A protein has these predicted regions:
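The feature marks the mature, well-folded catalytic cores of soluble enzymes
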Residues: 1-245
């Protein structure tokens, strides 16, 4: 299911929220409408948490995370860190990172298995990313853009990349990520996909300007019409049992 929303009339919804299969962070402030859109879709499946990071409301651009963990910049205050820790499931590891490229959401993007990162990201940050988020890390560009988190969004089901990504690059990225990809836009033609939407394995949220065509592409590539949290959990449990057998 894909849902349209805006934060104080701003359609760059991916700046103000962070969505994974285990939790959802939503920026503090503005109206309760923004929070209630997420709460309405996610209630009973994962916690939806009001948060700020380093005193900023653009939390989606400041952090990177998946169901295993969450990385935040070193400028995150102790109170913010403690609040997020208390609100997230115990299985989610949270860690502060000393990184020059501190807008982690712009320079990294990941699902539960693979991460793409800015070619100049610190080696130490890459190791922490692999350890805390339990992902394989690839230094990559998307359509020659180094801000992979801004121009690419993917879940465990599929992904959308910058509209000017060549077919060869799409194929290369798709084989790295092991998910189908499509070149597309959100918010009526915006190339900055990471800022315009958030997605997990059963739900997507995008800006109010997103057209019905863009919405149908999103629902199709992320397989949102087939997905429900319960079936995903069951599939994950079955595969886990198989791997342990």
């Amino acid at each position: 299911m894909a849902v349209r929303a805006s934060f104080e009339n701003n359609n760059e919804l991916g700046c103000f929220a962070k969505l994974t299969n285990a939790y959802c962070l939503v920026a503090i402030g503005g109206s309760e409408n923004f929070y209630s859109v997420f709460e309405g879709e996610l209630f009973g499946t994962i916690p939806v948490v009001h948060a700020s990071i380093a005193g900023c409301r653009i939390i989606g651009r400041m952090c990177v995370g998946n169901r295993h963990g969450l990385l935040v910049p070193s400028s995150t205050t102790d109170q913010e860190l403690q609040h997020i820790r208390n609100s997230l499931p115990d299985s989610v590891r949270i860690q502060r990172v000393e990184e020059r490229l501190s807008a982690l959401g712009n320079v990294t993007t990941c699902n539960d298995y693979v991460a793409l990162v800015h070619p100049d990201l610190d080696r130490e940050t890459e190791e922490i990313l692999a350890d805390v988020l339990k992902v394989e890390v690839f230094r990559q560009t998307v359509a020659d853009q180094v801000l992979v988190g801004s121009y690419c969004v993917f879940s465990n089901q599929g992904g959308i990349v910058h509209p000017r990504t060549s077919i060869e690059d799409q194929d290369e990225l798709s084989s790295l990520l092991q998910v189908p990809l499509v070149a597309g836009t959100v918010n009526r033609g915006s190339e900055v996909i990471g800022a315009g939407m958030v997605v997990n394995d059963w739900c997507a949220f995008c800006g109010l300007d997103t057209t019905s065509t863009e919405l149908s592409v999103i629902e199709s590539i992320f397989k949102l019409n087939e997905a429900q949290p319960s079936t995903i959990a069951t599939n994950m449990r079955d595969s886990l049992i198989d791997s342990l057998a």
